[in-house]
């Protein structure tokens, strides 16, 4: 997967089971489902931006299209190691493929990178992150 949906949504495959994107909109949920996703993880806190739909709105729209939705918010620049562990557990329990999103995709990518500690070799984590446009080198000591 490396889809551009509409003019706003840019979905990039991080792994075969996980893609990341910037903020998704209610109006794009059908397209997300039609693209084959089975679950969504929201990593953006409610109220971060004036034009963003709440997680409750996202979850309701997701349900309409048979998608599961989970809320794991983190403030920009404040993703904790624990967030990465919970993210990893969600990836193991949610049906895939999964779409994770935040404002830009950086927090979702960071949580994935942290979740892969001891699972995926570090060079592969860095390479996959770079391919979707995010540099995780600053996280090396935490992975």
For each predicted feature, which ranges?
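Substrate/cofactor-recognition hotspot
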Residues: 105
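Cys-dependent protein tyrosine phosphatase-like superfamily
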Residues: 2-98, 110-143
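Short cysteine clusters
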Residues: 102
